[in-house]
Amino acid sequence: MAFTDRLLDAWYKGHPALALLRPLEGLYRRVVERKRARFLAGEGDIYRAPVPVIVVGNITVGGTGKTPLILWMIEHCRRRGLRVGVVSRGYGAKPPSLPWRVLPDQSASEAGDEPLLIVQRCGVPLMIDPDRSRAVQALLAAEPLDLILSDDGLQHYRLARDLELVLIDAARGLGNRRCLPAGPLREPVERLSSVDALLYNGAMADRGDGYAFRLKPSALINLRSGERQPVDYFPAGQALHAVAGIGNPRRFFNTLEGLHWRPVPHAFADHAVYSAEALTFTPALPLVMTEKDAVKCRAFAADDWWYLAVDAVPSDAFVGWFDQQLLRLSP
């Protein structure tokens, strides 16, 4: 087991050695609390966009289903006649310059895997830059927009925001509820009391403190041909290689098992860089990966490589609440 996997396991299942990291946790907490206090006091260089900004993020390390929910939000806003743009840090991207407009024919190494996925799926105007304030300004200079979605950036306080949504994995929760490096939290758990809404990925129903949403498999898509098949394309009991380089690979493997297949799991680091050699497994079986991984593998994909497209399905209560917020934010 890799070091990062062991650390995640300790954060979410407990380990006595984490007590040794509490002095560092104390230092980390003071830094992030001071940073937020400066934002609340209006100190520093804070940019407020001329259009509403909605931040979709989390306070935990690891995946929470953020990209599928952002895709849902883009389409939902478009159906209401809103022109939407997205800004992202572009983790792992190496663009020629910053800020950088992501286009569907770019490579994942240039644009970042998640931004490229979003643009290829729905063609939204999207700008990457670690400085999200600069990304928003560049995007507004390039496109007439009514609304900006910030992919992550909850802790990027230089960008003023009108709405904060925080996603939590319902199965893993907040782990030991401690901050880095003694736990998985980017900010103290008390931060959740100040956000506008919590969304629990995988929850069976809305909770007293937040809304439920789930990820619904929608299709199997061939990496080479683009052929689209229903999720029952493989028969029950089909053995296949399952590749996931996401924040929580186990969730993807569980999804495949829920479709009654027998996945041979191959977990990679989040934002992993792939090669044909790295994805050559024995025995020879069909290979199914996440859509986020697929954007990095099309150039060398084999004929029997597929990705599982998933769609976010939020609860009716969240949809109603979100529509109210859009009305409130509309000019």
UniProtKB/Swiss-Prot annotation:
Catalytic activity entry: a lipid A disaccharide + ATP = a lipid IVA + ADP + H(+)
Residues annotated to bind ATP: 60-67
GO biological process, one term: lipopolysaccharide core region biosynthetic process
Superkingdom to which the source organism belongs: Bacteria
Any single Pfam family the record assigns to this protein: LpxK
Recorded GO CC terms: plasma membrane
Annotated keywords: ATP-binding, Kinase, Lipid A biosynthesis, Lipid biosynthesis, Lipid metabolism, Nucleotide-binding, Transferase
GO MF entries: ATP binding; tetraacyldisaccharide 4'-kinase activity
EC number: 2.7.1.130
Pathway involvement of the protein, from the record: Glycolipid biosynthesis; lipid IV(A) biosynthesis; lipid IV(A) from (3R)-3-hydroxytetradecanoyl-[acyl-carrier-protein] and UDP-N-acetyl-alpha-D-glucosamine: step 6/6
InterPro entries, per the entry: LpxK, P-loop_NTPase
Stored NCBIfam families: lpxK (TIGR00682)
Family: Belongs to the LpxK family.
Functional note: Transfers the gamma-phosphate of ATP to the 4'-position of a tetraacyldisaccharide 1-phosphate intermediate (termed DS-1-P) to form tetraacyldisaccharide 1,4'-bis-phosphate (lipid IVA).
Protein name per Swiss-Prot or TrEMBL: Tetraacyldisaccharide 4'-kinase
